Amino acid sequence: CRYQQYFAVKAMLERIKQDKKGGVVWHTQGSGKSITMVYITKKIMEDKEIQNPQVVIATDRVDLDKQIHKTFNRIGVEAARATTGNNLTELIKNEKIRVITTVVNKFETVVKSGVTVDAPNTFILVDEGHRTQYGEINRRMQEVFKGAIYISFTGTPIMKKDKNIFDKFGGLIHKYSLDDALKDKAIVCLLY
């Protein structure tokens, strides 16, 4: 993994183990947020202090969900992909399923089913959380996963008075800016 991924995972693990709270990983586009999600999931699963963890990776688009699901499985972290709201409900209820990828709109069906999870070691990794976590979708997720630790991954955080991603998720965990990525030559400018 790249250094920003290593330090982000280290900071996330410290935050969830010491403070029992989530926050925001602000890494610019193209810097490997999906792989960072895989690594933090792997660390959570391997940590002996975190008993019976379950990790849910929530995206806002089907193509992102498919991509993240493939990335997890390709790297060797077995993830189940929720194909429908009813399927998500069944995956959540199945205690043998440790990692789930899903699209956020499927939580409406889970809420209607009445299924809730109040386990202390449930982690929700929200891809591009600035797009979906200020209204009904977030309310549904919170209703299903009552005591979960939420971590948002974003390249473009919202910091308005009424919509502030850092207030919503519990502060900044790690930042890797566009300038950092350009300096490292991890990304390049497009001129047109």
Where are these regions (language model features)?
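RecA-like P-loop NTPase motor core of helicase/translocase proteins
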Residues: 1-192
